């Protein structure tokens, strides 16, 4: 009888202990959810901001009729959520070039822009932020090669177009390198687009509009090189 009573007491204590454990685990789970929940008034991370900018690229580019890729680039970079620097530009450069290029083509040669812009985004987002510093290759310049590879349907097994795509990227990188650091994603985007405009005219026979560029964002760039920048505002 004593054994049975003792056993039942132990069983009861065990049930109570398990019940307490379940209650505590449930409370901890609720606390964890509350901690991970982002309040509406919190500031979005740079990654979320950049994603918002890129999400609207296709919509803006599909509606744009300009043959001036710098003009298109400016519209894309002027979105409220577009950061001063960052991998967003690895998509914007190629998208601006693609849009202006397509607007220069006759109707019979138009690209499937929805598919092309989706491809620019997919490839551009594979180029990591900081590639200019950590890999020695500016993502904005690489974006010119992405643009070229799409319009020429280039693959790793191509011949002449393989040369063209790599050459375009190399020339853009050369311009970026000659102007030195520290990095400025706006400056490097301008340099890359202007280089691609000349390259496309010479090698593909398509003439996009090439304007004079003046920077309007030097005041918000903490690393601005000032008068050394080729796009510094005129006094």
PLM-predicted stretches and their roles:
Residues 1, 36-51, 217-220, 226, ...:
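Cys/His-rich short segments
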Residues 158-201:
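A structural-propensity feature for long, helix-poor, extended segments
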Residues 93-104, 114-158, 162, 166:
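Conserved mixed alpha/beta catalytic, RNA-binding, or beta-rich assembly cores of soluble enzyme
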């Amino acid at each position: 009888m004593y054994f049975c009573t003792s056993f039942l007491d132990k069983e009861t204590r065990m049930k109570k202990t398990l019940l307490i454990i379940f209650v505590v685990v449930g409370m901890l789970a609720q606390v964890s959810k509350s901690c991970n929940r982002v309040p509406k008034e919190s500031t979005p991370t740079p990654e979320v901001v950049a994603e918002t900018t890129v999400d609207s690229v296709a919509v803006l580019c599909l509606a744009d009729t300009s043959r001036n890729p710098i003009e298109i680039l400016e519209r894309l970079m002027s979105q409220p959520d577009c950061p001063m620097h960052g991998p967003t530009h690895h998509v914007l450069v190629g998208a601006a070039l693609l849009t202006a290029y397509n607007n220069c083509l006759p109707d019979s040669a138009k690209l499937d822009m929805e598919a092309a812009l989706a491809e620019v985004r997919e490839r551009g987002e594979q180029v990591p932020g900081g590639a200019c510093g950590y890999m020695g290759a500016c993502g904005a310049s690489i974006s010119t090669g992405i643009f070229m590879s799409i319009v020429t349907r280039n693959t790793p097994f191509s011949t002449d177009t393989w040369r063209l795509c790599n050459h375009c990227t190399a020339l853009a990188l050369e311009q970026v390198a000659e102007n030195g650091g520290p990095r400025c994603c706006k400056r490097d985007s301008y340099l890359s687009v202007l280089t691609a405009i000349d390259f496309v005219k010479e090698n593909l026979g398509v003439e996009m509009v090439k304007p004079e560029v003046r920077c309007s964002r030097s005041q918000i760039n903490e690393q601005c090189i000032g008068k050394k920048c080729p796009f510094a505002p005129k006094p």
